Amino acid sequence: VPSFKRDFDKLFNPKSIAIVGASNLPGKWGFMMSMNVVGGGYRGKIFMINPREKNILGFPCYPSIKEIDDEIDLLVVAIPASKVLGIIEEAVEKGIKNAVVVSSNFAEVGEEGAKLERRLSEVATAGGLSVVGPNTMGIYSASTDLCCMGAPVYPLKGNVGFISQSGNLGIQLMAWGQRRGIGFSRFVGSGNAANTDIVDFLQYLGEDPITKTIILYIEGLKDGRRFLDAACHITPHKPIIALKAGKGSQGQGAVLSHTGSLAGEFKLFQGMMEQTGIIEAETTEELVDLAAAFSSLPVPSGNRVGVMTLGGGWGVAAADAFDREGLEMAKLPQAVIEELDKTLPSFWSRRNPVDIVGNVNRANHFKVLDALASADDVDIVISMGTLLGRNFWVENMLKTTIRPLINMIRFHTLRLPRFELSILKGFREALSRSKERNPEGSGGINPNEALQWRDSVFVSHLRDLMRKEKKPIITVAVNEGERSASSLMRDSALFTAATPERAVRAAGKLATYSRFLSNHSNKARSSNI
């Protein structure tokens, strides 16, 4: 437990930053940190510290922090390890309360480095200076556009707070998150955690008003009891999702060589997660999925799922995963069946999953979703195969029309007139049938119906439906899996899974958190009796 009061508000919302080791040379850590702070849009005061330079990136240079008359809220250190202690001593003398030490070669490299790190911690702690690192990739804060990181990643702004014991992995996951449309409020790579650890930042994010969901990448804990107490305080009002590294003996060895920390017994940590309501992510991919789901979807009231599919196979793939994830296929009430009888063909299955049997009328898709989401017996809705992905029809029409035409010209030139006539005849017949279905119309394709197939219309309907029913609706896109899911999430701020299994997995984790909240609420009520 720290012997001094942390001032993380100034860490994440600094009015001034001094960068020791700032450089004009691309490839140096001092250059990358300086470039990202400036390029990220930070608008506070920036002081570049380098006795060998007159200016860096257009900013005047100072030989040391002693030469700066202004108050410094955040010190960034990117110099060799042997020189860091002297800078920390100067920072304490100046009254600086927060430092990000990017420099490596401390406890992660052996006993000599560990001794230097212990001395750094002693000096900083005695002076009331909170050190992020050493051996960190830095921090990010949406509220001040602060991209104080060692890689050119500029996250989307949002409500996800991220604490990672691997800065490299953390920044990579934020880059993936950016492509998926996930917005971040804060990020901190804790590094070797000389005198601040994951619990300090967890406590801060638990009270942080702009952070609604917390995700963690954890390699080891210095104080399990303190972590447990912090998590117990946070999870009843904010979800925490954790990926624990070092599950096996080989992983534990890798953790020790990475940050110099002990990974600990994984089963013990799993028990801690169950006790505190922390949601476990088993892979980096799942951590990103769950960050997207929890930050964009309401928490369900139970585990009963209504499924709408464009074809039967989608429903089977999803149902296979239900038992693994603790989900229940909702039983459709008679009122819902009768409502769907008005919309779907007479041969539909009249059960969940609701297979819309290739129905291409977009209005009918909306009616099925509305019926499922409004049913009291349904807590979560999964829609599969009805969200197409940006430009799906245009791209595929071009692919399926132009390529055969080219091949026809190349290999069957003499048959080309007959080929063209066949296509024209087919179009004429389609228009004729459309006229029969809609005798009062123009005889062509209904423009309003065509417009409803735009993803933006579908997504807008989902968003309104979720607001109305306060239930999560998860979609699985047809087109190109991960790429399509990423673009749709980025454009719509909704959770779109790349596969049925990942959709069900996310639904299961939402239901698990719902069950925890329900149990916690019951315990709280019991304690007040």
Question: Could you say what each language-model-derived stretch is?
Answer:
Residues 1-529:
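Catalytic-core regions of core metabolic enzymes
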